[in-house]
Design a protein with these regions (language model features):
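Sec-dependent signal peptide recognition
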Residues: 4-9
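C-terminal motif of bacterial Sec signal peptides marking the signal peptidase cleavage site
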Residues: 16-18
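Bacterial signal peptide processing site
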Residues: 20-22
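Short, low-complexity, disordered segments immediately C-terminal to signal peptides
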Residues: 24-33
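Post-signal-peptide N-terminal segment of Sec-exported extracytoplasmic proteins
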Residues: 37-71
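Short, solvent-exposed coil/turn segments at beta-strand boundaries
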Residues: 50-55, 72-77, 105, 122-125
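A mature extracytoplasmic/lumenal domain signature
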Residues: 60-64, 73-77, 82-86, 123
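C-terminal low-complexity, charged extensions that often adopt amphipathic alpha-helices
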Residues: 84-125
Length: 125
């Protein structure tokens, strides 16, 4: 009976892992850091994007500097950096910002899960 329960839990876990959403990250020229101001219903946010060794690291912080999301995108899959809970809307936002970088756009609005995000590139040179 115990073996049957363990097998069932393992099967459900493997099924859930197999259903993880994959993202197609655009191919970008190397860059060390890009910074964006993000307007949302949560107030002003800052997004920091780093490109290193075939992975993209995203840090989204609020006006007080507290992290809202810290994620890494590698091989089409997001993983947490730290202990913040995953947020699928932020994952989609991060991929859209990568597309914005690829298309060399400085400003764009996105609608994700009934939430409007206004993203503007910040020049930190």
């Amino acid at each position: 009976m115990l073996v049957k329960k363990i097998a069932m839990i393992l099967a459900v876990t493997l099924l859930a892992l197999g259903c993880a959403k994959k993202f197609d990250a655009p191919k970008l020229a190397d860059f060390s850091l890009k910074v964006f101001k993000v307007g949302s219903s949560k107030g002003p946010l800052m997004l920091y994007v780093q490109n290193s060794e075939n992975e993209y690291k995203f840090s989204l912080v609020n006006a007080l500097g507290a992290p809202e999301a810290r994620r890494v995108l590698k091989d089409g899959t997001f993983a947490n950096l730290g202990f913040l809970p995953p947020n699928s809307a932020y994952n989609e936002l991060f991929v859209k910002v990568l597309e914005m970088i690829k298309d060399e756009k400085n400003e764009q609005k996105f609608m994700i899960d009934d939430q409007i995000y206004e993203v503007k590139s910040v020049d930190i040179r």
